[in-house]
């Protein structure tokens, strides 16, 4: 599929929406983890170290997702975000019909 400049601008917005949903999910997961009670053999230091590890892992994931904005990765990015359910078919409603159908048939 050949994407026009307008398609690419729209897909950038769609990708941003999906990435922000993943960010929101991570923040909610991390907040729930931080606020849960300590286990029997866990303390504040252990919790801080786990949060640091999770943040480092998420940073790596987020940097990989930033590649979705590159022209050569847009189609892969939208497909991945759809498969992971960070995007829905409704998110593609602003795209040309040809583009929308291409992503929804995958």
Question: Which ranges hold each PLM region?
Answer:
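Acidic, Ser/Pro/Thr-rich low-complexity regulatory regions
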Residues: 1-106
């Amino acid at each position: 599929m050949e994407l026009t400049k307008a398609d690419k601008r729209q897909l950038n917005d769609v990708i941003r929406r999906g990435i922000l949903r993943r960010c929101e999910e991570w923040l909610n997961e991390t907040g729930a983890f931080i606020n849960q009670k300590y286990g029997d053999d866990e303390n504040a230091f252990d919790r801080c170290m786990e949060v640091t590890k999770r943040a480092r892992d998420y940073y790596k994931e987020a940097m990989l997702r930033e590649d979705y904005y590159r022209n050569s990765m847009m189609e892969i990015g939208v497909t991945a975000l759809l498969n992971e359910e960070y995007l829905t078919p409704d998110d593609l409603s602003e795209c040309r019909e040809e583009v929308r159908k291409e992503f929804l048939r995958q």
